[in-house]
Each structure stands twice: as C-alpha cells, then as structure tokens.
C-alpha cells in the first residue's frame, strides 16, 4: 500500500533551507581546501582528513614522506647518493648536514609527528638508502654508520622498516660494497634490539595499514605490488615471479625494487623505486619488471617516475597503464630524465604537454639536453607536495623552495579532480 504524504508550505520551505545550508556547507568546505597557499608563504599545516605526499629534494636521491588522512606516517626511501663531480645537482639546502639529516628534519617539520610509523626501502642502492665513507659517523653502538635511512632513524625513530627481502636475499644481493655492508649491519642492529624489520609482503593490503584512526578512513587503501622480482597478480594475495630465481646472469638490483600503490577515495598514488623496463632490445623479457607492475596498478592519479625517469624506465606500458594526470620525477643526476621518457610522461606527441610533470631537481645540463621539453615542466627544482582533499575527490600540487628550511611556496597547481 502506498502512503501519500502531503507537505505544507512551511515544511517545504524548511526543507529547502536545509538543503541550501547543506550545499553551502559543502561548498565552503571545498572552498577552504581550494584556498591556495600564497606564493612566498609557508605551507599551511595539514588538516585532519587531508593526505600529504612530499617528494623531498636534497639533490642526493629519493625520499618521499606520506602523511595519511589519520596522521599515520610513511617514508619511502632516504637516499644519500654520491657521484662524479659535475654530474649531480647541487646539494639542497647545502652540504652542512648529511642528506638523511635534512630528510628527517623536513619530516619532523611537516608530519606533525616525532616518529615514523613506516619506512619502505625500495631497493639496495645508495640514492635510496645511503652511502658511506671513512668520515661517515658511527651510530651509538658502533655497529654501523649514520647515513640515509639510518640517519633518519636516529632523528625520527622508525616503527616498522620494510625491506624488499630481509633477512634472506638468496642470490639477489648486489655486489659487495661498503654501503651494502653498512645497511645490512644497520638492519641486524635493529633486529637485535627488538625493533621491527619486515620483508615486503607482495599482494598485501595490510602491511601499510593506518595506525591511528583507521576506522574513520575506510576508503584509504594500500597495496604492495612488487618486491624482489615478484609481482601481485591483481587477485587476492596471489603473486607471480617475473625475474627467474636463477637467471642466466645476475640481474641488476633495480628490477627487484618494491612497488606500491596508495589510494584514498577516488585518489591514488604509485611509487616503484627504480623498477625498469630495459630488456636489452627484447633479448631478456624477464628484465622488464616495470610493465607488469604498472599493469596491475592500473589507472593512477599521481605517479612517481620509475628510476628517476632514466633511459631504461618509464616505458610505453608504464604511461599507458598508469595513465596518471601528474608525474613526479625525483631527479638529481645529469642523466635524469631521458628525452623519450619526458616526452612520454608529458604526452607531448605534438610537442605540447598534455599532462603535468614536475621534477625535484633538474640538472642544468639535463635541462639543456631536454630543451625541447624541459620548458614545459611545471617545476624544475624544489620539494613537490601533493595535498589531497578530505575524502580524496581532489588534490593540489605545491612546490616548495628547497634552498633553505623555510620551504616557502614557489608554485601552486590545481585543483585536479580525481577520476577514480
């Protein structure tokens, strides 16, 4: 039986006013998020429900700080690389501190926390975990030196460190080197002290779970897509091995990188360390770990360029399958990025960019080599911050000055509407 409800004029007016008020409240909330932080002003503090992703520019390697909607903190890599004179970007802010110290200080300023819930070390290279020499200071227990990841840990204690394979790397360890011995010594010291070190659990959607108010943000999701040559299939917790356990020759460390995807409502973010697609012109298809990871990641709003946009990464499948609106190149070397990679990420097939691409530190000689496209970068220097609105329906990009610790805003972009 259908019940007919008759509404008088007063009831209708009340309803209209309530709807108008709700619409105004929604518009005001969105307008509040859209209020652009002014050029030359400091970055406003993150508000509850927003998600921030900071690509930190030290000129010495990758480091990305993620502050989830509930305040859970994650750092992806803490690089402190070295290179021949003239081939590296200038140290940012300067060389008075080690890169890991700068990264930790940045995270302490912008995370609202004194500790990191998670550190993901994507793979075993200095520009992602830290280099050492005889002058690098020893940790308090004397078992390892402070650099990169261990420098961050000393200033901003890491709750859970996620490594691509710890403690059993099988036959996949890179050639012995001081930095590698130091990093493994650091992990052993952590484990001996009862501090958590985990192997990346490929396919897991729980290894990077929210720590503070998870139930308030049910649309936040994380997924470990790949590690040590194993890639998620896209089904449940199933995985597939891409790099053979006993390849015909020793695989380069980059193909073993951790890949991950974070999502919040309709927003999504991809990071894949130094995953690459170079197969020696088709001779060794298994060396392409980038393409299967991009395929399972699917369309993504913002993506960090694999391997700094270098010549062997960011191939056609990477850009086609991620289909990102924004790409961020964590560049610091004269070779970052390659011309084809820049054109591909920009979608500049008619010489005009159709996607927004940002670089944390474009080397002047690289800008010259890439002059056909470098002028179309949205930024060539500075910390690149993705600020996602509560709920994930939109986001903005803010570029911060990396020449000192004031980190004043030098550019604002967006808002971008998340496509889901």
Each predicted region: which residue ranges?
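Flexible, acidic/histidine-containing loops and adjacent segments that form or flank the divalent-metal
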Residues: 32-51, 58, 106, 112-113, ...
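Zn-dependent metallo-beta-lactamase
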Residues: 18-25, 29-73, 79-91, 223-231, ...
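N-terminal secretory signal peptides and thylakoid transit peptides that target proteins
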Residues: 2-20
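Glycine-rich, histidine-containing beta strand-loop boundary motifs that form or position
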Residues: 16, 78, 164-165, 273, ...
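Catalytic metal-binding/acid-base residues of hydrolase active sites
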Residues: 59, 81, 125-127, 166-167, ...
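Conserved protein kinase catalytic core
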Residues: 63, 83, 129, 280, ...
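Active-site metal-binding motif and surrounding structural segment of the metallo-beta-lactamase
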Residues: 69-74, 80-162, 293-310, 323-328
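Long, structured stretches of catalytic cores involved in phosphate-ester chemistry, encompassing
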Residues: 131, 290-387
